[in-house]
């Protein structure tokens, strides 16, 4: 990754645009931010820019959603976390925004309005086209430098994500730098053996990751859990029962069965599948071998014998990349697979979690300090692990070529 970082630039007295990802769960009735984790992740970058005029760019949700709102509550939250005043401007690039930025002093933080209030920001476009938008040209004219720190949106190509990097000198913020460094380590220097644990309901993403890390020999083993495992069972010709089969169809993953079969045929010794599962039968947890699942009972977790087997395999790993739960952990009866595997994964030398629900469970279990890295970007992390270059990373590299030293 050949892009600039904060260590490569002088920021004292400069006006610096910083793109963050403050997109958070919000209670629409009270406009209260329910989780400030994403704010906390960006604090080190903002603190590192204490000698500059900092102009923060962020979004909240998207048009049409109930939580698509102004960033007034975000300014209050940031003010409390930074323990300093934050100037909120309900404007993105108009006269009010320009005046607020012009009047700021080094050490000040200005938070502009939700960038998705600008129609241009909601369009996917090439970076060179993004650089020509009114949004980017107006923002770039207000500042000397751009710091991109929003890993959670790095898999998108929209004006403030990739266009600004083509319009002005841009470097990665501390969070972005950390994410790329830790996730790159999975491919370059992770202690062996490396086990990927792929679960949850995003079957297409998990199968793409499995195919990539097995083909390039990044993974020594791939443990398949959750709904992803159900697709692999179908690929083996196993009857998983009507409810689980219907769920795969409803989620639109029928075509993934053939891809799962290709992986099983190509890497028969490298794919781990639970042999025992837990189903909901008469509202109770009942465990069966996968070949004897009752026809009308949904599979909601791994069985105890498989939890023990998988936990042992994880503890014998040097590195683990964990993405997605083993079952419906929101129901206490079906949480043990997810909880126990996450506990086992916490004990290895190098452990990475792909973000999203899994990261939330790790925090809930108090395991966060034991993990090497919890990614802040679910979709971006997955796309990175499939081997694709994220648009924001490509734009950072292009900016450094164009404007860097």
Swiss-Prot record:
MF terms (GO), sorted A to Z: ADP binding; ATP binding; phosphoglycerate kinase activity
Any single GO BP term: glycolytic process
GO annotation, cellular component aspect: cytosol
Pathway terms, separated by semicolons: Carbohydrate degradation; glycolysis; pyruvate from D-glyceraldehyde 3-phosphate: step 2/5
Binding site for substrate: 21-23, 38, 59-62, 116, 156
Residues the record lists as binding ATP: 330, 355-358
Cell compartment(s), UniProt: Cytoplasm
Record has Kinase as a keyword: yes
Record keywords, A-Z: ATP-binding, Cytoplasm, Glycolysis, Kinase, Nucleotide-binding, Transferase
Domain of life: Archaea
Substrates-to-products reaction catalysed: (2R)-3-phosphoglycerate + ATP = (2R)-3-phospho-glyceroyl phosphate + ADP
Major localization class: cytoplasm
Top EC class for this record: transferase
SUPFAM superfamilies: Phosphoglycerate kinase (SSF53748)
Coiled coil ranges: none
Entry keyword Chaperone: no
The family this protein is said to belong to: Belongs to the phosphoglycerate kinase family.
UniProt protein name: Phosphoglycerate kinase
Source organism per UniProt: Methanocorpusculum labreanum (strain ATCC 43576 / DSM 4855 / Z)
Gene: pgk
């Amino acid at each position: 990754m050949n892009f600039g970082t904060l260590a490569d630039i002088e920021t004292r007295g400069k006006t610096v645009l910083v793109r963050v990802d403050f997109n958070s769960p919000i209670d629409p009735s009270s406009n209260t931010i329910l989780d400030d984790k994403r704010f906390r992740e960006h604090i080190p970058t903002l603190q590192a820019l204490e000698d500059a005029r900092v102009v923060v760019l962020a979004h909240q949700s998207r048009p049409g959603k109930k939580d698509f709102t102004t960033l007034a509550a975000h300014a209050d939250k940031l003010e409390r976390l930074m323990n300093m005043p934050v100037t909120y401007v309900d404007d993105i690039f108009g006269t009010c925004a320009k005046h607020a930025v012009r009047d700021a002093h080094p050490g000040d933080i200005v938070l502009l309005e939700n960038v998705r209030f600008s129609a241009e920001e909601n369009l996917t476009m090439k970076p060179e086209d993004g650089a020509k938008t009114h949004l980017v040209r107006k923002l770039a004219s207000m500042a000397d430098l751009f710091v991109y720190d929003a890993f959670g949106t790095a898999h998108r190509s929209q004006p403030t994500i990739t266009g600004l990097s083509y319009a002005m000198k841009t470097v990665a913020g501390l969070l972005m730098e950390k994410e790329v460094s830790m996730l790159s380590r999975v491919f370059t220097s992770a202690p062996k053996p490396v086990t990927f644990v792929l679960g949850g309901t995003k079957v297409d993403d998990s199968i793409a990751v499995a195919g990539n890390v097995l083909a390039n020999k990044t993974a020594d083993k791939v443990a398949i859990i959750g709904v992803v495992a159900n697709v692999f069972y179908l690929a083996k010709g196993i009857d998983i029962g009507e409810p689980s089969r219907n769920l795969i169809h409803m989620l639109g993953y029928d075509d993934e069965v053939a891809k799962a079969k290709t992986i099983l045929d190509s890497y028969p010794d490298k794919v781990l599948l639970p042999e025992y599962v837990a189903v909901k039968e008469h509202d109770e947890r009942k465990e069966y071998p996968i070949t004897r699942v009752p026809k009308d009972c949904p599979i909601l977790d791994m069985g105890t014998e498989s939890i023990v087997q998988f936990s042992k395999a994880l503890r014998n790993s040097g590195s683990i990349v964990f993405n997605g739960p083993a079952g419906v952990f929101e129901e206490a009866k079906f949480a043990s697979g997810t909880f126990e595997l996450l506990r086992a994964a916490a004990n290895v030398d190098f452990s990475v979690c792909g973000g999203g629900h899994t990261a939330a469970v790790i925090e809930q279990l108090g395991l966060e300090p034991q993990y090497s890295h919890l990614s802040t970007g679910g979709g971006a992390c997955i796309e990175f692990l499939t081997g694709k270059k994220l648009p924001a990373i490509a734009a950072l590299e292009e900016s450094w070529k164009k404007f860097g030293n």
